[in-house]
Amino acid sequence: MGGGHSALSGRSLDTFEKIRLRPNGKKKYQIKHLIWAGKEMERFGLHEKLLETKEGCQKIIEVLTPLEPTGSEGLKALFNLCCVIWCIHAEQKVKDTEEAVVTVKQHYHLVDKNEKAAKKKNETTAPPGGESRNYPVVNQNNAWVHQPLSPRTLNAWVKCVEEKRWGAEVVPMFQALSEGCLSYDVNQMLNVIGDHQGALQILKEVINEEAAEWDRTHRPPAGPLPAGQLRDPTGSDIAGTTSSIQEQIEWTFNANPRIDVGAQYRKWVILGLQKVVQMYNPQKVLDIRQGPKEPFQDYVDRFYKALRAEQAPQDVKNWMTQTLLIQNANPDCKLILKGLGMNPTLEEMLIACQGVGGPQHKAKLMVEMMSNGQNMVQVGPQKKGPRGPLKCFNCGKFGHMQRECKAPRQIKCFKCGKIGHMAKDCKNGQANFLGYGHWGGAKPRNFVQYRGDTVGLEPTAPPMETAYDPAKKLLQQYAEKGQRLREEREQTRKQKEKEVEDVSLSSLFGGDQ
């Protein structure tokens, strides 16, 4: 290729350098991309001169088209570059690589060829009977043929058991994977579980109990069977321990009457799985409570997960949903749910409690509290009525404040309340709550008739002579007791004086001394 980029020259090269690598991208094709394409052609056994013509690019595209879907990044880049060069040779105006690839595929109908090839491949891989290979038993040439379970199905079952750890999801997963299976296939699904042998032992005990109950209710007919007649299945036959695959197929599809041993065995296994799930998930629905900061949606998920593992009739589960779901919610959600009325739907509850406990709900409550407080502050002063006129504390006049008063500043004592001196220079004691009255320093009395200005004031109603006055009686008792004490003190004093007189010297000489 001479200079390494002789595939394009002149105007073709200018057009090539204007095409973008990606839609709406900044990078564009350069000469180095042509040099790289020439080197890559040798790896696929193609000559580099094929890039110089439209027909040569067409041959390269035909070679690379089958390899492009599963090829490497280098092969895909070479295919895209050949499409761009073909568009330049064919004078097809394109803006980027993606548009060039679409133009080439539409011109050579490569899209239709790919669809036909994929359709042909699917037809060759489909089973002859027209049934899906995922179904264990298929009808081929008017004969029922058993197909073993695919490793993908078994792997999905084992992965579910290992991840969910016998959660409530295991039972519906088993129902989906074992649809249409025979007893042989169900046993195969149970045998691939390596761990959890304790759970499998519980499952076996449930299967044995159900098989014994089947044998008790389905007694085999007495006497030998007619020639060519198929025997009735026993409990062990349904469990797949004493029956072959062909016998299970005959009982399921050709017997008269038909007995779907696979479906019956699935019921037994589902009962055992439900018991295992209940034992491995001891948490009851009654114990599910919403946390103080837990979203209501997460609480509902935990509640229904525990309810799914609960072995109870449907009416009991409905009662649990209607009562316990609201009863065990936190106070915030419970207050909202009770406002929805009787028997609200789950959708209404989820919408009503959306965001409760989160930052948005807390911010909303904070805004409501602040608005209520602001309203209380605004409404509070209005109840006291309008404020009165301003009063000066210096001169006592209305209309101005003390700092605006033009009168001389008066000094007032805070102890006695008089004007002219300060509290530190006050000679009087501190005034009590009654202040200083006309009684001076004496204790004020509560009786009006003892006041100086009301000495001659008499009560208008006459006193009741027969009325009992406890205060007067008590005062009389105090007066009598005081009189007795004074008399005792006087008598004691006189006795002491007499004793002193007896021991004096005047008694020795008589009255003449």
Swiss-Prot record:
Q: Which Gene3D superfamilies match?
A: 1.10.1200.30, Human Immunodeficiency Virus Type 1 Capsid Protein, Immunodeficiency lentiviruses, gag gene matrix protein p17, Single helix bin, Zinc finger, CCHC-type
Keyword Lipoprotein in annotation:
yes
Lipidated positions per record (N-myristoyl glycine): G2
Provide this UniProt record's keywords sorted from A to Z. Answer: Capsid protein, Host cell membrane, Host cytoplasm, Host membrane, Host nucleus, Host-virus interaction, Lipoprotein, Membrane, Metal-binding, Myristate, Phosphoprotein, Repeat, RNA-binding, Viral budding, Viral budding via the host ESCRT complexes, Viral nucleoprotein, Viral release from host cell, Virion, Zinc, Zinc-finger
Fill in the misc note: This is an African green monkey isolate.
State the protein's purpose.
Matrix protein p17 targets Gag and Gag-Pol polyproteins to the plasma membrane via a multipartite membrane binding signal, that includes its myristoylated N-terminus. Also mediates nuclear localization of the preintegration complex. Implicated in the release from host cell mediated by Vpu. Capsid protein p24 forms the conical core of the virus that encapsulates the genomic RNA-nucleocapsid complex.
The Swiss-Prot or TrEMBL note on domains reads: Late-budding domains (L domains) are short sequence motifs essential for viral particle budding. They recruit proteins of the host ESCRT machinery (Endosomal Sorting Complex Required for Transport) or ESCRT-associated proteins. p6-gag contains one L domain: a PTAP/PSAP motif, which interacts with the UEV domain of TSG101.
Q: What is this protein called?
A: Gag polyprotein
Q: Which organism's genome codes for this protein?
A: Simian immunodeficiency virus agm.grivet (isolate AGM gr-1) (SIV-agm.gri)
